[in-house]
From Swiss-Prot:
This is Phosphoribosylaminoimidazole-succinocarboxamide synthase. The keyword Transferase does not apply. The gene is purC. The keyword Ligase applies. Pathway: Purine metabolism; IMP biosynthesis via de novo pathway; 5-amino-1-(5-phospho-D-ribosyl)imidazole-4-carboxamide from 5-amino-1-(5-phospho-D-ribosyl)imidazole-4-carboxylate: step 1/2. NCBIfam families: PRK13960.1, purC_vibrio. Belongs to the SAICAR synthetase family. PANTHER family: PHOSPHORIBOSYLAMINOIMIDAZOLE-SUCCINOCARBOXAMIDE SYNTHASE (PTHR43700:SF1). InterPro entries: SAICAR_synt/ADE2_N (IPR028923), SAICAR_synthase_Vibrio-typ (IPR014106), SAICAR_synthetase_CS (IPR018236).
Amino acid sequence: MSLADSVLAVNNDLPIRTDSPVHSGKVRSVYWLTDADSRRLIQTKGYNVPEDTPLAIMVISDRISAFDCIFHGEGGLKGIPGKGAALNAISNHWFKLFAENGLADSHILDIPHPFVWIVQKARPIKVEAICRQYITGSMWRAYSKGERVFCGITLPEGLEKDQKLPDLLITPSTKGILTGIPGVPAQDDVNISRSDIEANYQAFGFEKVEDIDLYEKLLKDGFKVIAKALADLDQVFVDTKFEFGYVTDKNGNSKLIYMDEVGTPDSSRIWDGAAYRDGKILENSKEGFRQFLLNHFPDPDILLNKDRMPEREALARDNALPLEAMMDVSRTYTGIAEKVTGAAIPLPANPKADIIKILREEYDLIV
């Protein structure tokens, strides 16, 4: 098996029994199970959900996206070795820690394989729940140009790049394109304020206005749990994005849960603590890959300017990145995952065959 064979790049073609179209995201694909299979698994596996809960198989890939494009490497490498397993392992670890700390549940019911989650269907909150402890990235770029108000929060004068902020900031943005909300443009990833959410809480998917307080508490508490655990590893938790949704429990009550992934190198910035104390930034997240791309291509404006999206898509499609750059990203992802979990990240030679075998023999979901 070659290195390219060990990468799971295409994850929407598995022969999983479903009667719905496969949903393919940038990194994960979701296979909604039939009602009969959902009910069977809930009963035979003992999942603690109502018997009529829709279930899905969520399969992560090793693809890497940045600036809203998928990139590839030399030698037919269509993703990053170990990336998918690393992301899932980190999320699994944090979700377990959240439960131990009495925070909310996640959508994950079962983990059949390092690339696979069995999840319950949730009603998503249409908010990218972003939390920032340091001023860097897009916030710093805007601040350095004179902006002081972010998502309704006014920052003080005199902040410096990469400085720790006086308070943990919640700077939400829209998830998907939302229409008909006063003052909120119908575009993806638009910054919004808490007052925007309060005035239109149902349009953002909240069932009760009081749940805005709960989402902020779960966001801050989750951030603090991860930040403390990373600090013990001499890593700095800089900023992150969480996602939330509602599920119905066995008593028929709605409850807010964590969704998607949490505290990963894809959804967060993580800095090496020793380097930060020396005044340097050593990324243990996808931000390092973004910076590589900005330095690698002669016209970085293509990657930053949303008006040049066709050029950006062509850039990603037509340029194979150096193998060493792809392996640098692999080392970043597997390295931070092994630090966080305390365990080696498995790198199966043929992940697709392994997934099919497990889902056939242990779950009877393969057609």
